Amino acid sequence: MSCKEDRSTPFWDTSLSENERLDWLLENMTLDEKLHSVSSGGYDLERLGIPGHNLGGEAAHGVEARNDQNGFGKPDISTSFPQPIGMSASWDTELIEEAGRVTGTEARVIAGRHNGQGLSRWAPTVDLERDPRWGRNEEDYGEDPFLTGEMASAYVKGMQGDDPNYICCAATLKHFYGNNTEDGRGWKNSSIDPRNRNELYLEPFRRVITKGGASGVMTAYNRINGVPGILNPEVQTILKDQYGLLHAVGDGGAMALVANVHHYFGMNAETVSAALKAGVDGMSDRPDQVYSAAREAYELGLLKEEDLDRSIRNTYRLKIRLGLYDRKSRSPYDRLTEKDLCSDHNRMISVKTAEESIVLLRNDDHLLPFSANEISDAADDEGKLAIVGPLSDVWYQDWYGGIPSYRKTLRQGLEEVTGKSIPCAEGYDRVIFRADGQPVAVDDDGSLIVGKEPDEFYRMDWGSGNYTFRSVRTGKFLTSGLYDASEHPERLGKISAAADSPFDWFVMEIFHLEKNGGGTSGSGSSHKENEGGTFTISDRFRRPLAVRPDHTIYAQQKDGRASVFTMEVTADGTKEAVNLARTHKKVILALGSCPMIGAKEEIDRKTIMLPSSQQKLIDQVTEVNENVLIVFITNYPYSFMEGGKTASGLPGDLLQEGVRRAKAILWSASGSQDMGTALARTIFGLSAPAGRTNETWYKRDDQLPDINDYDIIKGRRTYRYFDGEVIWPFGFGLTYTDFTYRNLSLAMAGPSLVEASFEVTNTGSAVSDEVAELYAVMPRTRVPRPLRQLVGFRRLHDVRPGETVQVRFRIPTAELSYYDTISGSMMTEEGDYLFFAGRSSADRQTQKVLHIPGAVPGKRDTACRIRADHYDDYENIELTEGRFGMTAVSLRDENKKGEIVFRDCVLGDEATHGKLLLKSKRGCRIQFLVGDKEVLAFRGDTASYVASASFRENSLNEGDRAPERWPAVWDEIEFSLPDVKEEDRKNATITIRMEGDVKLLSFRLFRPDPDAHRF
């Protein structure tokens, strides 16, 4: 930023109101300056002496200030907390607010180093985790909108601070909305009906804006019901007009995607215009591209200056509240200093957050906690404790994490807590390669070459065919050259041992091995098979590796010859781990994931199964040692099931045998600088675990619908609707003591407020935290309701043995509402509601029923227009863009029939006809059913056109004008109703069956007026 400030103008005058300062700004900006200011990049108004200050930056779990993308150069260190999925597992809103406060404080300090840049951060992510295969699972807060809303609100409150006039660091929620698929996220459509939208997908945003006070929202790349996220009018109509949101931005590059990927518009000018009118204030594409698009939009008449003014007013209002334009600083956050960065206090919050995020999933025979006398020197052949597994002694960087001042691996944490050296075996095989018969080695400059004595590599199997290889001799990872190709074309595709860790936007340390003759090499293959087989090896982009004449190895850029590789296992890593486990009394088996491999931004998981190499470790380690603690360091749930027989002797699912043998299991997310310390303190009882799962750990892949299916209700997703068996349910977590729940009491405290209280007693022998959870079960009603729904939770701290804590909640009855597709509004239905309290969503220790007053569902008046997307049920349907403020119903697969169902319909006594408002280009067939009475309502399209007279008295002669083919139009198609019994007219079920190319907006029933076409 090189703009020279001029603080003499009224814009810098803090004695004026925000609106007065903004009025002056808009009155004095030129049109060209306004067009430049549509970019979120922060355009300097040099003529007015007003620096732009960009809006952007990340803060998912602390400030991301690596500075590897923004041109600032050297990283700024910051405190790194657990990934959001981990922070949320603490179920501690007060602590997460403190973590947010540390994040906001450090963002403010770091911004002071960079002329105020980075005070509006794109965090937190509040997209619902409806599917554990989502690649960005780590960034979110769980599968429940209430938990997400409470936890993310706390983080936002901490980030933004509590000053009534100034914001410490502005929080921008991601990604509005229906963003839960990475593969194809730039063009796919999220089909979301009104119930899913209002009850689930909008809820985290509503809660974190209205309760947490989030300043901004970032739109999603994907389409929502046919409309690209950056063009979604709900940004204005819902987020701003209803929730009170201040500011909205598009995701990085989202403007260009509309034309280049969605092909929704042909020009960026159209996108800028539509986005601004939809309520998006800033485009996060290249500033020069945004300016060109805005300039063209204005010249074409697509944009008016008032559209620009509205956007600029929102953007600069936020910047004023950040204190960026005070003539004399009045913001309390400007008093923060370098001492507030990575301070002792911040580290204390980091350790506490990491500890509270740990979830104890199993503790048979009270294996945990370990005691200090169970540690011996590593030189002791009959040692007491060892650690094995691929996550034993490693700390992986994630994309949205910052650079902390230190990082603690699990092994380092154990050694820090115990003061002893802990023997370790990662369990990786060591292998050597031959390419076209020649040994593969690492040259002095790191290049991978052939012809020298072969080098050994650690083979790391991450599942789904993803491998990394680390040189045993140099410690560097193999990587495939991608960048600097323009200046150094010789680097493109070059394979070298040059990376310290798998990390970058494109993780070029990933390789794939394909057996010649078909198949992928898996870690379950025997050594003999590996030694005897030949392979094609390819890089992250599936470019096959080949030896060049100069003996170097490259990834081929085009269809070139692939070298034939052989791989020989020189050391069996599993055997080494097993031998270590066999000679120690207790073993910690550290398993999990690397946040840059297999699941990340742009990459979804293909399976929830634990990689076979890790399953193999579990099998063999637990076979030789009966005291195994498994520590999962991962940001998403795994499954580890096998076929077998249930207790009744019938075929069923069983936990894999090795997992069953493990006596204790802990789960921790990655990302915290104190991850290893927190785990070690928990293992040795210096901290008592009380975290809870925030998403379901399913048993099998086939329990999950298509990842592209966004219907949580019909798809039976999440704990709210899934009725099958799971490994661990939502809200589950054990402690080192026992707790009982009793005496649930319920009462109405007014017409729309429930008061609930119950007792929680520590019946064990250890002091511990406990997360008290309260759920509601909805009465049977005309539509599917949640099987259970979280309505209250509280983390109780340091509950002593024998102590009883009274837990109270005040629950607005609106928490029990659902979207009524008949009235088109949220409704709390009158009825008997069951409430239960316990330690998870599956634990009903104390329960009670309360009658809650409310509304009674009505009937559908078919004389009024019925929106097609307000159905009660459907098959093979996708929602897409409509018109007239309505969403269109189309077929997901045009080669199959589809239908929508409307129950509780009332037909007028005289209704004899119906009208369908639809559009069809290639032709469709629609059947209309009232009960079991059926009529063919329409067959054809709305593109064919035959001219007709305006009035039947003035008809054209037949043949005066031939039929023509035009673009399809929205048309109301009239049809006759089937004969319906009188009693069926009072409570009918209407089904509309569709075939072909159709977009249906609505229907209504009526009796035609015979005189309607007369003067």
Question: Residue locations for each model-derived region?
Answer:
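Short loop/turn segments at connectors of secondary-structure elements within structured domains
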Residues: 115, 167, 689, 766-770, ...
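A glycine-anchored, Pro-Gly-centered beta-turn/N-cap motif
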Residues: 465, 476, 533, 543, ...
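Extracytoplasmic
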Residues: 525, 832, 841, 851-1015
